[in-house]
UniProtKB/Swiss-Prot annotation:
It comes from Rattus norvegicus (Rat). Its EC number is 3.2.1.31. Contains 2 glycosyl hydrolase 1 regions. However, the first region lacks the essential Glu active site residue at position 241, and the second one lacks the essential Glu active site residue at position 874. One of its GO terms (cellular component) is apical plasma membrane. GO terms for molecular function: beta-glucuronidase activity; fibroblast growth factor binding; fibroblast growth factor receptor binding. The gene is Kl. Keywords: Cell membrane, Glycoprotein, Glycosidase, Hydrolase, Membrane, Repeat, Secreted, Signal, Transmembrane, Transmembrane helix. The keyword Cytoplasm does not apply. Residues 1-34 form the signal peptide. It comes from the Eukaryota. The lineage of its organism: Eukaryota, Metazoa, Chordata, Craniata, Vertebrata. Residues 1005-1014 are cytoplasmic. This is Klotho.
Length: 1014
């Protein structure tokens, strides 16, 4: 056996290089797994791509165990008692007593009788009167079920002069009583030492925070608080929102103390605030942490900013914007003790310098990152120059991700967050509630999807109070306070009930009704697609000129007509139309069983009557429906649909009042008769009127439209049904109307009222009583509006029951509120505020994607009109025309069809069909399953998803057995003669066979005989 060769040794230099490369890869991998400080600029690129629909909507998940659920308040905003028990004056007492501080947008409060009430106060002298209502406030906390309560101590209440002299015992007793009550409830306090209310004596003596000496006085005040309250407090905030204190207190003068100094003074004040904070943190860390075991930080406010364009320059400007607001204070504390480079480069002559010892003193002086995010800074007090020409955005999730990357993954406690409503809004604060939902949802996504370490959330605020420069013109509380009342009772708003339920669930846990359902529809379920107006193109694909031509090959090189020679004309065929076959091919690719489209009344009858009938167009429609039948696709044809121009009516009818004219109803019946005669042999599903726009239609027009529908229905029922055996109805748009505040009875009443006006107006006469809804009539009478016509008894009988099925179009869900919040979206006529849940997914056209709304609409229709056969004759969404994947449509179709399945399987709705909207972008841009450009149709990816649902007849899970449905074959409409005469045909066939056989035998033997005699 030969000896084994010794192993080859790698050169020493190569080993060193490989080792270096390995270490480099490990380093790069580590940086990818956890970005180093200062990497916040990556955030914009990370969120630049639009997320998949599943990640854009509501995330059904819960917060980590031990998550801190808090609510907050500030002393000056809520305490009142400005002269009680020895309290000293603060800069806000002085500032608000000056007329300049009265907000210009203070609301005029009206009594129930309509008379104006006395004007609201313009100061915080009484505010919510928390100083005299400790038990009331803490009962509010108990109702909410929070784990933590953030409040601030009034410096001037415990030290009236601001300096460490004899403290105010009554002030100390008030806070001790509050802390004791919190302990009884099991609620942990989060205490802010300074929330903008500096003792006026310190402002007068030292010039406020512009004097560096104030840092020492702040340290003394903090030491007093730590000594008296520290045993019960585990979370301390030194200063709230130093940006606002420095910039708007001492530079712009918009807030107390109202110093309109230079920007240099603003930067100097911020410098002193940072030193003051660091002194207090060092004091606690050295003298109190060992025995009290608490944590100390500073509450930093911030906005979020997005680039106008995704370029390096605009991203740098966004980074600079955050540096100038949040980084101004966060970088010295959380990184290196110094200001951001962008500030130092741009403000070299204005920005004070830290000494090296001060940098070391400030650096690391926070035990967690306390974040304030809300309207006060983000959208009201952000200086325009600090946006750097970029765009503000209320995206808390992206800000949390930026902080996580920029400041080395700190623990983040959101210590202030919320929104606001108008000062006239009472307890149904839907806008605030949905912003609260949005921010909490974004916090959850930051935790679960982005890995950000968010440890707590604080809703702002516990109760309505004095809102700084806005006075009482807005409200931010979870509890309503009547500032003109004596007792100042706290009344829970819808937002409080929502927050209480959310805390109880620890987030948004998956619910059974949110889970997709596995199952199938019945075998005869109609799977369709919609194209509101098919392209009527009567161009023939074959050469139809009857003349004969010769090719002049020697001279002109042209065709020369031969005079007197004409070819025989052939009968036209449907296959000659070049526009029909491509559309049939598209439908076959989708594998739909039904196709809905609308006829063009004005095209068929240009004059509105049968004195002039466009036979070419009528022949095209006849060919279209017959070819659909031959392709085993059932046509569903609408006689009329509102469209431009002239509402889709013949011009002659439009110029004479359109549907305002009762003659239009008679003309419609005449037009329907023509269509039934010409197309009824192939069409078995008719829609008289498709999606009449009830919101843009007068009551008189709706009255005539209902009679037109009924006339057409009875015409078909009496004259054509027996022979054609079709079905006919009207298709109404039924978008779901949901109460904005689910806890509000008034919102429920408003939602029902809007549904009756939107849907019941036309549905109740047909599917219900034969007359208009009582709700509608009563409301109009209250409004002294007597324009809604009355039906005669004969008309009621004519209209009632004029249907064979209930057809509805459904696209979205709308929230309604009775409180007037946004004048632009407020309907004074119905006294309803329309809005949307900002956590909902939206299309590019801002259509909300709310799948459960379809199920609710179907159940409401059954509740109102009984167990009728229903068809969803249109359901779809627009998409981004530039996106390769129409992922929104895939998500939309899948989830809406699944809700339809729930309605059928779980609720027992007699649902017979579903039609997706729409076939192509040709007639409705951005809404089709096919892109259309340069006369070419390109399928979008969503077609495969819809086709899969059709093939499965629903949703088949791993353990779901599909329902066996026998294959259906095309019915030959001309085969009846043969089916009924089988015996005769067999006999004739036998005779023909015998005759042919005899001829063959005669021919054979005659040939054989001739050969024999040759």
């Amino acid at each position: 056996m030969p000896a084994r060769a010794p192993p080859r040794r790698l050169p020493r230099l190569l080993l060193l290089r490989l080792l270096s490369l390995h270490l480099l890869l490990l380093t790069l991998r580590a940086r990818c797994l956890s970005a180093e400080p200062g990497q916040g600029a990556q955030t914009w690129a990370r969120f630049a791509r639009p997320p998949v629909p599943e990640a854009s909507g509501l995330l059904h998940d819960t917060f980590p165990d031990g998550f801190l659920w808090a609510v907050g308040s500030a002393a000056y905003q809520t305490e009142g008692g400005w002269r009680q028990h020895g309290k000293g004056a603060s800069i806000w007492d002085t500032f608000t007593h000056h007329p300049r501080a009265i907000p210009e947008d203070s609301p005029i409060v009206m009594a129930p009788s309509g008379a104006p009430l006395p004007p609201l106060p313009s100061t915080g002298d009484v505010a919510s009167d928390s100083y005299n209502n400790v038990y009331r406030d803490t009962e509010g906390l108990r109702e909410l079920g929070v784990t933590h309560y953030r409040f601030s101590i009034s410096w001037a209440r415990v030290l009236p002069n601001g300096t460490a002299g004899t403290p105010n015992r009554e002030g100390l007793r008030y806070y001790r009583r509050l802390l004791e009550r919190l302990r009884e409830l099991g609620v942990q306090p989060v205490v802010t030492l300074y929330h903008w209310d500096l003792p006026q004596r310190l402002q007068d003596t030292y010039g406020g925070w512009a004097n560096r000496a104030l840092a020492d006085h702040f340290r003394d005040y903090a030491e007093l608080c730590f000594r008296h309250f520290g045993g019960q407090v585990k979370y301390w905030i030194t200063i709230d929102n130093p940006y606002v204190v420095a910039w708007h207190g001492y530079a712009t003068g918009r807030l107390a103390p109202g110093v309109r100094g230079s920007s240099r003074l603003g930067y100097l004040v911020a410098h002193n605030l940072l030193l003051a904070h660091a002194k207090v943190w060092r004091l606690y860390n050295t003298s109190f942490r060992p025995t009290q075991g608490g944590r100390v930080s500073i509450a930093l406010g911030s906005h979020w900013i997005t680039p106008r364009r995704m370029t390096d320059y605009h991203i740098r400007e966004c980074q600079k914007s955050l540096d100038f607001v949040l980084g101004w204070f966060a970088k010295p504390i959380f990184i290196d003790g110094d200001y951001p480079k962008s500030m130092k480069n741009n403000l070299s002559s204005l920005l004070p310098d830290f000494t090296e010892s001060e940098k070391r003193f400030i650096r690391g002086t926070a035990d967690f990152f306390a974040l304030s995010f809300g309207p006060t800074l983000s959208f009201q007090l952000l200086d325009p120059s600090m946006k750097f020409r970029q765009l503000e955005s209320p995206s808390l999730r992206q800000l949390l991700s930026w902080i996580d990357l920029e400041y080395n993954h700190p623990q983040i406690f959101i210590v202030e967050n919320g929104w606001f409503v108008s000062g006239t809004t009472r307890r149904d604060d839907a806008k605030y509630m949905y912003y609260l939902k949005k921010f909490i949802m974004e916090s959850l996504k930051a935790i679960r999807l982005d890995g950000v370490d968010v440890i707590g959330y604080t809703a702002w605020s516990l109760m309505d109070g004095f809102e700084w420069h806005r006075g009482y013109s807005i409200r931010r509380g979870l509890f309503y306070v009547d500032f003109l009342s004596q007792d100042k009772e706290l009344l829970p708003k819808s937002s409080a009930l929502f927050y209480q339920k959310l805390i109880e669930n620890n987030g948004f846990p998956p619910l059974p009704e949110n889970q997709p359902l596995e199952g199938t529809f019945p075998c005869d379920f109609a799977w369709g697609v919609v194209d509101n107006y098919i392209q009527v193109d009567p161009t023939l694909s074959q050469f139809t000129d009857p003349n004969v031509y010769l090719w002049d090959v020697h001279h002109s090189k042209r065709l020369i007509k031969v005079d007197g020679v004409v070819a025989k004309k052939r009968k036209p065929y449907c296959v000659d139309f070049s526009a029909i076959r491509p559309q049939i091919t598209l439908l076959r690719e989708m594998r739909v069983t039904h196709f809905r489209f609308s006829l063009d009344w004005a095209l068929i009858l240009p004059l509105g009557n049968q004195t002039q009938v466009n036979r070419t167009v009528l022949h095209f429609y006849r060919c279209m429906v017959s070819e659909l039948v031959h392709a085993n696709i059932t046509p569903v044809v609408a006689l009329w649909q509102p469209a431009t121009p002239h509402q889709g009516l013949p011009h002659a009818l439009a110029k004479h009042g359109a549907w305002e004219n009762p003659h239009t109803a008679l003309a419609f019946a005449d037009y329907a008769n023509l269509c039934f005669e010409e197309l009824g042999h192939w069409v078995k599903f008719w829609i008289t009127i498709n999606e009449p726009n009830s919101r843009n239609m007068t009551y008189r027009a709706g009255h005539h439209l209902l009679k037109a529908h009924a006339l057409a229905w009875h015409l078909y029922d009496d004259k054509f049904r027996a022979a054609q055996k079709g079905k006919i109805s009207i298709a109404l748009q039924v978008d779901w109307i949901e109460p904005a505040c689910p806890f509000s009875q008034k919102d429920k009443e408003v939602a029902e009222r809007v549904l009756e006006f939107d849907v019941g107006w036309l549905a109740e006469p047909i599917f219900g009583s034969g007359d208009y809804p009582h709700v509608m009539r009563e409301w109009l009478n209250q409004k002294n509006n007597f324009l809604l016509p009355y039906f005669t008894e004969d008309e009621k009988k004519l209209i009632r029951g004029s249907f064979d099925f209930l057809a509805l179009s459904h696209y979205t869900t709308i929230l309604v509120d009775w409180e007037k919040e946004d004048p632009i979206k407020y309907n004074d006529y119905l006294e309803v505020q329309e809005m949307t849940d900002i956590t909902w997914l939206n299309s590019p056209n801002q259509v909300a994607v709310v799948p459960w709304g379809l199920r609710k609409a179907l159940n409401w229709l059954r509740f109102k009109y009984g167990d009728l056969p229903m068809f969803v004759t249109a359901n779809g969404i627009d998409d981004d025309p530039h996106a390769e994947q129409d992922s929104l449509r895939m998500y939309y179709i899948k989830n809406y069809v699944n809700e339809a399945l729930k309605a059928y399987v779980l609720d027992g709705i007699n649902l017979c069909g579903y039609f997706a909207y729409s076939l192509s972008d040709r007639s409705v841009p951005k809404s089709g399953f096919y892109r259309y450009a340069a006369n070419q149709f390109e399928p979008k990816p969503s077609i495969k998803h819809y086709r899969k649902i059709i093939d499965n007849n629903g949703f088949l899970g791993s353990g779901t057995l599909g329902r066996f449905c026998p294959e259906e074959y095309t019915v030959c409409t001309g085969c009846g003669f043969f089916q009924t005469r089988k015996s005769l045909l067999a006999f004739i066939s036998f005779l023909v066979f015998a005759f042919v056989t005899s001829l063959a035998l005669i021919y054979y033997y005659s040939k054989k005989g001739r050969r024999r005699y040759k």
